[in-house]
């Protein structure tokens, strides 16, 4: 890196800093924190534990965003001042130190961008994930099971809990369907970018001729919504089916039809649960899953992205990422347009860099 490149980097990071300020409005955050402090000292505030908890959650989020912004802002201002002085004095030693620290400066801004992208209304929620293989039988079902393991490993790496709701094992290998909840801070915020079609290209382990095969699997992610969110679901729009739990995925096997499948006829959304021995509990969980999916659909309808998507894409999703194992190894995301060569690590749950790359690419898009 030379002085020209560093100067250009400072301009780029300053622009990003200014864009962040326009979005988060630091002065407004400080005003809101002042209002919260006054609330905390008001009579009877702590008597309503639920309301107090919501306010405290908002406070922590605002404090975290403001702190990260202020740290990044200060770091850029300090770097600018030091760079100007060092350039005027031709201080090679200081310039060298600034160049070495440039990566840290970029990370400061990246950290704020990610924090902003995780500040949506439901980003802090748990994530309900449903994985469904595309056409292709065993090949696609095996790919679905690889993705299932990838998300479970990601959750494990972050110390998040996983609750399996439904797991339908494939006849030869893989899975026909899987639904599960990942429970942890910002689980939905991170995983919301996984909505869509995931494409795999590899030499098939199921092909005696060792030919290259392409498989597709759909991943659907929705926030675990609170019970108090009002989503109208009419009984006439539902079809309920019962079936026996399959016993795969560490779940129990039983001889009664305790598993529940609910089809929402107007949208075609299907949810199913076999997590519990009780049909009543499975039905309650399935309704919660349906509620989350309908809420996610409503959010999509409100977004500008919805207007540009075909109806077929809404129902099935759109291709978001390719995983190529042969003839070369690469994972490429269509949103961030970033390619990664560490495909084995990614499939083993090392997803943070990839997820953050998508979040930041969305932050940089006009209108985000």
UniProtKB/Swiss-Prot annotation:
Coiled coil: none
Alphabetized SMART domains for the sequence: PCRF
A single GO cellular-component term on record: cytoplasm
GO molecular function terms attached to this record: translation release factor activity, codon specific
Top-level taxon of the source organism: Bacteria
Compartments in which it is found: Cytoplasm
Keyword Glycoprotein: no
Alphabetically ordered keywords of this record: Cytoplasm, Methylation, Protein biosynthesis
Modified residues (N5-methylglutamine): 251
Post-translational modification: Methylated by PrmC. Methylation increases the termination efficiency of RF2.
Alphabetized InterPro entries for the sequence: PCRF, Pep_chain_release_fac_I, Pep_chain_release_fac_I_sf, PrfB
Function: Peptide chain release factor 2 directs the termination of translation in response to the peptide chain termination codons UGA and UAA.
Family: Belongs to the prokaryotic/mitochondrial release factor family.
Protein name, UniProt field: Peptide chain release factor 2
Record organism: Wolinella succinogenes (strain ATCC 29543 / DSM 1740 / CCUG 13145 / JCM 31913 / LMG 7466 / NCTC 11488 / FDC 602W) (Vibrio succinogenes)
Taxon lineage: Bacteria, Pseudomonadati, Campylobacterota, Epsilonproteobacteria, Campylobacterales
């Amino acid at each position: 890196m030379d002085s020209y490149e560093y100067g250009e980097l400072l301009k780029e990071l300053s622009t990003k800093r200014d864009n962040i300020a326009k979005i988060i409005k630091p002065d407004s955050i400080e005003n809101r924190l002042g209002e919260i402090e006054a609330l905390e000292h008001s009579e009877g505030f702590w008597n309503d534990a639920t309301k107090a908890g919501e306010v405290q959650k908002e406070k922590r989020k605002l404090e975290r965003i403001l702190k990260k912004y202020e740290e990044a802002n200060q770091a850029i201002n300090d770097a600018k001042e030091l760079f100007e002085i060092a350039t005027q004095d031709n201080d090679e030693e200081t310039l060298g130190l600034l160049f070495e620290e440039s990566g840290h400066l970029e990370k400061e801004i990246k950290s704020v961008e990610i924090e902003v992208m995780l500040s949506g209304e439901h980003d802090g929620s748990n994530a309900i994930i449903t994985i469904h293989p595309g056409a292709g039988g065993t090949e696609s079902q095996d790919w679905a099971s690889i993705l299932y393991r990838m998300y479970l490993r990601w959750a494990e790496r972050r110390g998040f809990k996983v609750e399996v709701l439904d797991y339908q094992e494939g006849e030869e290998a893989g899975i026909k369907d899987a639904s599960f909840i990942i429970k942890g801070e910002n689980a939905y915020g991170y995983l919301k970018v996984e909505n869509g079609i995931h494409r795999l290209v590899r030499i098939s382990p199921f092909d005696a001729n060792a030919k290259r095969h392409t498989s597709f699997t759909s991943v659907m992610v929705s926030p675990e919504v609170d019970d108090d969110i009002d989503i109208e679901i009419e009984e006439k729009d539902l079809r309920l089916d019962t079936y026996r739990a399959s016993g795969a995925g560490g779940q129990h096997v039983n001889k009664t039809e305790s598993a529940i499948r609910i089809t929402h006829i107007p949208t075609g959304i299907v949810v199913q649960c076999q997590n519990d021995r009780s049909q009543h509990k499975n039905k309650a969980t399935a309704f919660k899953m349906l509620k989350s999916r309908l809420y996610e659909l409503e959010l999509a309808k409100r977004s500008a992205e919805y207007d540009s998507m075909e109806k077929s894409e809404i129902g099935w999703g759109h291709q978001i990422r390719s995983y190529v194992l042969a003839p070369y190894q690469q994972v490429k995301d269509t949103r961030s347009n970033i390619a990664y060569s560490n495909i084995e690590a990614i499939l083993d749950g090392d997803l943070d860099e990839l997820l953050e790359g998508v979040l930041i690419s969305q932050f940089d898009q006009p209108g985000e």
